[in-house]
From Swiss-Prot:
Cofactor: Mg(2+)
Further details from the record: Both phosphorylation and phosphorolysis are carried out by the same active site and suggest a common mechanism for both reactions.
Annotated keywords: ATP-binding, Carbohydrate metabolism, Kinase, Magnesium, Metal-binding, Multifunctional enzyme, Nucleotide-binding, Serine/threonine-protein kinase, Transferase
Region ranges (Important for the catalytic mechanism of dephosphorylation): 266-271
Protein name: HPr kinase/phosphorylase
Amino acid sequence: MADSVSMERLVTDLKLQVYSGEAHLKEKIVTLSDISRPGLELTGYFNYYPYERIQLFGMTEVSFTQNMTAEERLMIMRRMASENTPCFLISRSLEPPKEMLQAAEESGIPVLGSNLSTTRLSSLVTDYLDGQLAERRSMHGVLVDIYGLGVLITGDSGVGKSETALELVKRGHRLIADDRVDVYQQDERTVVGEAPMILRHLLEIRGIGIIDVMNLFGAGAVRADTSISLIVHLQNWSQDKKYDRLGSDTEEQMIFDVPVPKITVPVKVGRNLAIIIEVAAMNFRAKSMGYDATKTFEANLGKLIESNSDDEN
């Protein structure tokens, strides 16, 4: 979890244009993901002005300032240019008013821009800051992208998680993280997992050591991060434990405030775990699209029992 994001990093990661204040990019930081679009502030009402937020100007805001005199624009911009304001951000590649550039220069505030529409730019910056500023936790497991689904493979040490991930990579799927997965909540329904920088693209295989998946299999075999859609827990087979054979039992595991579907796969000699997990991901996708093989089987079984009962009567 980062406490803040510098304007320099924001410009680099989101490929923003710098109109002015390039010398202040490193020192200016933002600590909130919320963005402010000035409204009443442009009329001179500054009660509850969120000076600590990025100030976003779109077509509406810029055109409104054009109806002011130069003196009025300069006065308003100077009041908005608090020393704690991270930056002024302008959408649609609009030309910033001269008074904005002057007030920003006086207060050491960068003026940034983008060719995106105001709504898209707002969403892009908010999502980016949410990801950078979100609380992070570490989980033990392996995260793999299987057919576009983020599958977190968990289980006791030595159960075969990394070996299974290696087989999945050979089958064309993509590795995100091995051994340690850093997770954060992106929104109310989404949890994202990524690898720590030092472990990125690396996989540890007992007896072989550490391998670099990207160098061995190419850039298409790895991803930086992915949302976690399914948890597959590998558990050593036990005769004393009952396992779900129909897939009717639904489990969930809470990660932050998000319930993530979970299935338990018993590990036994001779079972191809990579194929099992691959099929589990495909089956999960089918269920999310409205087809449930278990419910179909139960419905057909019910019809058969009902038909046999009618024949006996």
